[in-house]
Amino acid sequence: IGFLHSLGTNDKKIKSVFIVGGGLITFYLARLLVDSGISVTIIEKNPERCNMLCEKIPEALVICGDGTDKDLLDAEGLAYTGAMIALTDMDEENLIISMYAAYRGVQRVITKINRLEYASVIRQAGIDRVISPKYIAANEIVRYVRSMESLGGGDIKTLYRIIGQQAEMLEFVATPLTRHLGVPLSELPLKDN
């Protein structure tokens, strides 16, 4: 919801949004934007993904094409949209798309990156907002854990700050109510990586 509020600039409500990339974030974001009365245009390369987005979000205009193609972006009215959000899986593509949108005078330009070392370069290029799903998720987890600690609801023993304050490590105390108590780590149902 805070993300939607950030689309407003100087009391001018954004009425249209371009999203380049048709992944899961786009799916949920486009649904929120459409439900908020914002016109959404999605550009995605994968035809199957385009079909799915057309079926699930019929209110959005879904264009099957290359979001790095400036001729396509111009033909679809990029310069006249209120905001452009680059959500492809490639940081470099997102950077190029966002720089082009800023060059074309788009009011709000938001770029998704996975490698935070690009954040300063992107900001220097005149791009409004940089988002990192991994960083956002990590912050939400830390916020949740800290709230558990402050409410006395968790069994957090120690919070360590490591790697020059760039990472946090939590030490928990296992109680009889702890899920998977006594189960070796090798047998826990963990996701890869």
At which residue positions do the language-model features occur?
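Cytosolic regulatory regions of ion transport systems
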Residues: I1-N193
